[in-house]
Curated annotation (Swiss-Prot):
It comes from Debaryomyces hansenii (strain ATCC 36239 / CBS 767 / BCRC 21394 / JCM 1990 / NBRC 0083 / IGC 2968). Pathway: Glycan biosynthesis; glycogen biosynthesis. The gene is GLC3. This is 1,4-alpha-glucan-branching enzyme. SUPFAM superfamilies: (Trans)glycosidases, E set domains, Glycosyl hydrolase domain. Its EC number is 2.4.1.18. It comes from the Eukaryota.
Length: 711
């Protein structure tokens, strides 16, 4: 679609909607019409919600009305449900012996809204007891009676009789409801986002399902000690199939009951806030489980309840259902879902899963993105309804932010396509995300480690991949996430050290060549990704200390074993194992940003990519980063170009003994106690105004800071 950009007042006004995007990227000019269309489509829906519901925020508060609720003042229980294309609706459960005749809902309008209010018992108690089972029974237009779980239910638990999940009415006494004690933490202005990606169920060394309470008491202190300021919680939304890693959601407003109660999760988030850590939800709005009896699929007997009908509503690779983002009630459901997790559980933002699948009608399947802008704006390929939903979601976050004293909620997109303007504010003509995941970086590392000898590592290609991101759109860099930890793949530590991790990680035995190389490169890979790859950083739990095993959830194929569905945090507590060194280095790396503000600073200036020496040098926010990837060559008095003249000192050294290195750099004079200093001279070198000489051992990274500037 192409809209005119002539001289009328309306057209000039429309053009102003995308001025920020065009200023950043003039190559978007030919696609102005499509960008304006996105903005106008957002405005259309926004105005419609304002007219019909009072505001977007009100529209997204449907979780307070829809579903089964308790009125503590009157002791009444009420339910509202959107169920089109049925002739009868009943509430059934333990409370009425599953009788379909005693508690029938009444139609409220012609659009499919049904409602029922249940009076209290003779003892003035709720007619539906807390934590009792219930379902919605319907008679379809064809006369079939079906039973389904409420789409808005707040708790579901596995049946003791079969593998299906059962809906439960979560309505604890006020004295048993967790009360939040701590404010949402706000990051310091220079503190970049440092994300610890975690899954509650695997966050225990024991071969079992971990709990919210275990995570609160055992894992949160570890994350805090490391210096991460954000947690990304996976698999929170209820999913009947544990091995889906939480990505086949069955109940969108219920949190996973495997790990504990809703009150337990509230306590976890509140304790994280006390520690100054924000918590993001890994939200799955790209698709839904195809489960029928305990999911959303075929809820009212049709295949198009909240979803597209027919083949358009199915994801062939994921074997799941796809939402219809042009449907009014689908938007109500999904936007309310976002607000629900912010209001009820105090999540501080979202990582949106599967954004590439949402953005395109082809869902990115068998499509190789080349960077041609036509791939991002072709109306036959792009799902503009999904884009409008994502923009509405960010508009909602902005409105909630105003209500919460301008708290900045964070949004991250999992997108591999490189969609332009994805991470620009709506006010600049963008879709609204704060960050996108730099998904090319982990792929690069695996290819390098798997296919190239150390001598074949290409410094220029490495730097290009780490720095290749859209101007003005922030990225989260990472070496590996949960994807690389899954069975069938290997973590970086396992690619580097393989089976020797089981036999040669003891500090009581000498380094083997494999372990020596693995520990050194593990640190270097993480540091260069952290410092050069983006404006934020992510780590999957356990990888910070080189967790020795892959991740495999219990399933038929492994005999329902939990042996690999765990994280062995006990390894870092064993003083005789080398995992403690990797853990210590990762913590030092996080605190480096906390102290010096690396991530939020301008992109680094890379002054050297020496292929023969395998040396990379760059400056970022006043720090000088030096990497020697050569497997054997150490360099004495290596000349380094630097812009700022002065006296430099080491602030991080991967070869330090405290990080499992060899201590080849004497950072402190043993006799005087003075720190090693590097003095610049005014010789121009590698396009920098000054130079200094530095000893850089093989497979070592050092970070210098100017301690005393010279004019």
């Amino acid at each position: 679609m192409s809209l005119s950009t002539g001289s009328t007042g309306s057209e000039r006004s429309n053009q102003s909607l995308i001025k920020g995007a065009l200023d950043l990227d003039p190559w978007l000019e030919p696609f102005s019409g499509q960008l304006i269309h996105r903005q106008l489509n957002l405005r259309k829906w926004y105005d419609e919600f304002k007219q019909n519901e009072g505001s977007l925020t009100n529209f997204a508060s449907a979780y307070e009305k829809y579903g089964l609720h308790a009125n503590w003042d009157t002791k009444e229980v009420f339910i509202n449900e959107y169920i089109p294309n049925v002739v009868e609706v009943s509430l059934v459960g333990d409370f009425n012996n599953w009788d379909t005749n005693t508690h029938k809902l009444k139609p409220v309008n012609d659009f499919g809204l049904w409602s029922l209010t249940i009076k209290p018992t003779e003892n003035n108690e709720f007619a539906v007891p807390h934590d009792s089972r219930y379902k919605i029974s319907m008679v379809t237009a064809s006369g079939e009676r079906i039973y389904r779980l409420c789409p808005w239910l707040k708790r579901a638990t596995p049946s003791t009789e079969n593998n299906l999940y059962e809906g439960r009415f979560w309505n604890p006494q006020p004295t048993e409801t967790y009360k939040f004690k701590h404010e949402r933490p706000r990051l310091e202005s220079k503190d970049g986002i440092k994300i610890y990606e975690a899954h509650v169920g695997i966050s225990t060394p024991e071969p079992k399902v971990g709990s919210y309470k275990n995570f609160t008491t055992k894992v949160l202190p570890v994350i805090h000690k490391l210096g991460y300021n954000t947690i990304q919680l996976m698999a929170v939304m209820e999913h009947a199939y544990y091995a889906s890693f939480g990505y086949q959601v069955t109940n969108f407003f219920a949190i996973s009951s495997r790990f504990g109660t809703p009150e337990d999760l509230k306590e976890l988030i509140d304790e994280a806030h006390r520690l100054g850590i924000r918590v993001l939800l890994d939200v799955v709005h790209s698709h839904s489980s195809k489960n029928v009896e305990d999911g959303l699929n075929m809820f009212n007997g049709t295949d198009h309840y909240l979803f597209h009908g027919g083949t358009k509503g199915s994801h062939e690779l994921w074997d799941s259902r796809l939402f219809n983002y042009s449907n009014y009630e689908t938007l109500r459901f999904l936007l309310s879902n976002l607000r629900f997790y912010i209001d009820v559980f105090k999540f501080d933002g979202f990582r949106f899963d599967g954004v590439t699948s949402m953005l395109y009608k082809h869902h990115g399947l068998s499509f190789g993105f080349s960077g041609d802008y036509n791939e991002y704006f072709n109306s036959e390929w792009v799902d503009n309804d999904a884009i409008t939903y994502l923009m509405l979601g960010h508009k909602l976050l902005d409105e909630i932010s105003v209500r919460e004293n301008n708290y900045k909620f964070v949004s991250i997109a999992e997108d591999v396509s490189g969609m332009p303007t994805l991470c620009l504010p709506i006010g600049q003509g963008g879709i609204g995300f704060d960050y996108r995941l730099s998904m090319a970086i982990p792929d690069m590392w695996i290819k390098i480690i798997k296919h190239l000898s150390d001598e074949e590592w290409d410094m220029g290609s490495l730097v290009h991949t780490l720095t290749n991101r859209r101007h003005g759109e922030r990225c989260i860099s990472y070496c590996e996430s949960h994807d690389q930890a899954l069975v069938g793949d290997k973590t970086i530590a396992f690619w580097l050290m393989d089976k020797e991790m089981y036999t040669n990680m003891s500090t009581l035995t000498p380094f083997t060549p494999v372990i020596d190389r693995g520990i050194a490169l593990h640190k270097m890979i993480r540091l260069i990704t952290f410092s050069l790859g983006g404006e934020g950083y992510l780590n999957f739990e356990g990888n910070e200390f080189g967790h020795p095993e892959w991740l495999d959830f219990p399933r038929k194929g492994n005999g329902e074993s939990y042996a690999y569905a765990r994280r062995q945090f006990n390894l870092i507590e064993d003083d005789l194992l080398r995992y403690k060194f990797l853990f210590a280095f990762d913590g030092a790396m996080q605190h480096l940003d906390t102290k010096y503000g690396i991530l939020l600073s301008s992109q680094a200036y890379v002054s050297l990519k020496n292929e023969n020496d395998k040396v990379i040098v760059f400056e970022r926010n006043g720090l000088l980063f030096i990497f020697n990837f050569h497997p054997t060559n150490s360099y004495a008095d290596y000349k380094i170009g630097v812009e700022t003249p002065g006296v430099y000192q080491i602030v991080l050294n991967s070869d330090s003994l405290s990080f499992g290195g060899h201590g080849r750099i004497e950072e402190t004079n043993k006799e005087t106690g003075e720190k090693l200093q590097f003095f610049t001279n005014n010789e121009r070198w590698n396009d920098r105004s000054n130079a200094l000489f530095c000893y850089i051992p093989s497979r070592t990274a050092i970070v210098l800071q100017v301690k005393e500037k010279v004019v």
